[in-house]
Amino acid sequence: MNIKIVCVGKLKEKYFKDGIAEYVKRMGRFAKVKIIQVPDEKAPEKLSPAEMEQVKEIEGKRILDKIKDKEYVYVTAIKGKERTSEDFAKELADLTTYGHSDITFVIGGSLGTSNAVNKRADDLISFGKFTMPHQLMRLVLVEQIYRAFMINSGSPYHK
């Protein structure tokens, strides 16, 4: 299985980098994991709704350039479907069973993802109604993917 995580912006904090690197290393026995960072669009603090959409569109094009046609795509979104860890693990197992060996996860920038990115998604996934910094979302996402692998392997990691 190939897991790709496409995210907007650079990860600066060492503690996030270290945590993500640890989970990516642990997942090595289950999947090849690749994290691709696309540049965030520089914008002033206060934006009009039209300017927000423009920023999302620019970032969206950068995201879509990193996604291939055959990939199954999850986009993280507050309005996405919430799942339990067990449900998510079953979904990943089912995807591989039914021929999806290339799975891509998208984490948008601080304004979210464009309509074009959301339309490309095979599924919108939510990790709750809370708003999180996208840097933290990367760590949460890789931990949940790792947890899914551990559930599917029967490991006691998930109790």
From Swiss-Prot:
Catalytic activity: pseudouridine(1915) in 23S rRNA + S-adenosyl-L-methionine = N(3)-methylpseudouridine(1915) in 23S rRNA + S-adenosyl-L-homocysteine + H(+)
EC number(s) per entry: 2.1.1.177
UniProt name for this protein: Ribosomal RNA large subunit methyltransferase H
UniProt subcellular location: Cytoplasm
Keywords of this entry: Cytoplasm, Methyltransferase, rRNA processing, S-adenosyl-L-methionine, Transferase
GO molecular function, one term: rRNA (pseudouridine-N3-)-methyltransferase activity
Biological role stated in the UniProt entry: Specifically methylates the pseudouridine at position 1915 (m3Psi1915) in 23S rRNA.
Family: Belongs to the RNA methyltransferase RlmH family.
Record-level GO cellular component terms: cytoplasm
Residue positions binding S-adenosyl-L-methionine: G108
UniProt xrefs under HAMAP family: 23SrRNA_methyltr_H
UniProt keyword S-adenosyl-L-methionine, yes or no: yes
Subunit details: Homodimer.
InterPro entries: Alpha/beta_knot_MTases, RlmH-like, tRNA_m1G_MTases_N
Top-level taxon of the source organism: Bacteria
